[in-house]
Amino acid sequence: MKLVRKDIEKDNAGQVTLVPEEPEDMWHTFNLVQVGDSLRASTIRKVQTESSTGSVGSNRVRTTLTLCVEAIDFDSQACQLRVKGTNIQENEYVKMGAYHTIELEPNRQFTLAKKQWDSVVLERIEQACDPAWSADVAAVVMQEGLAHVCLVTPSMTLTRAKVEVNIPRKRKGNCSQHDRALERFYEQVVQAIQRHINFEVVKCVLVASPGFVREQFCDYMFQQAVKTDNKVLLENRSKFLQVHASSGHKYSLKEALCDPTVASRLSDTKAAGEVKALDDFYKMLQHEPDRAFYGLKQVERANEALAIDTLLISDELFRHQDVATRSRYVRLVDSVKENAGTVRIFSSLHVSGEQLGQLTGVAAILRFPVPELSDQEDDSSSEED
């Protein structure tokens, strides 16, 4: 993301002009734009024209509109963002108050104005404009007959290819059908890797599986690379890292990211930090339950006691339509930071973010036990009963 201009007043009102440069920037933009903001961008509008003879026709014209945002729609797989709203500035083609939908595009600038720029949104702009936050991890999660080829960016896990091949069971004295199907499966996975992984950007490719599938696959891939003189695969062989995962399903990627070998290789990436924080939370919940809580009320009470060491919070909560609720989460983040706590904002498009979402989207690891929080939890549950 490129920051063109930033004009924010002391009261935190103002506007920024940005240029999304890659697909992931559309996800950052989705998290920046909120209902009630004003968005100015170039767009296509269909307009009716009347000729001197009285015949009516229609043309598509490019014009610049400023909308008061009413709805935002994001397609995570296509990385497309559509913003619907009403026109709030005079325009020769569009009446004031008329509805229009702007489709924001990579490499086309837009200006976003808000009455209140909060700390979470401003931090996201800083991160989005930092080149160190680019996608640098890929993963192949596989089992016999099933594989997912994923890109792990700082903000999301993107499934780029799913490979499924029916593998017949081995039969006594006749393994040829099984072996042919397995080779066909491996070949399709290799093709998916070559099609979807950019080795100029990616620093590490995780190959995760149960059993010996990963070893057998890597042996096949590099034997074929030698035979066909595939320089791209051979030159990047050192980037492939084999790790254990319980299955070839996407959710098993979390296990691979938790592997200590992987964690050391990816120690500087946001994704690895999220995975470790969530893993630490689960361990604390199991071994010292008085130091691990989830749910907004419990976490707010822990914050009032100045007990929060690490706050885990989903970015989905900052997209809440209700301004008061959204502000409540922002205040929580600011307060934890002021009290020297660590804040981890999880992407809801990451496997770890999906898991945090199942725990209400907000959780905390405490510096010291707060037993009365557990008592309050028990009281509230008994009242519900």
Swiss-Prot record:
It holds the Pfam family eRF1_1. Keywords: Cell cycle, Cell division, Cytoplasm, Isopeptide bond, Metal-binding, Phosphoprotein, Translation regulation, Ubl conjugation. One of its GO terms (cellular component) is cytoplasm. It is found in: Cytoplasm. Its cofactor is a divalent metal cation. The modification Phosphoserine is found at S374, S380, S381, S382. One of its GO terms (biological process) is regulation of translation. Component of the Pelota-HBS1L complex, also named Dom34-Hbs1 complex, composed of PELO and HBS1L. Interacts with PINK1. Interacts with ABCE1. Interacts with CNOT4. Belongs to the eukaryotic release factor 1 family. Pelota subfamily. This is Protein pelota homolog.
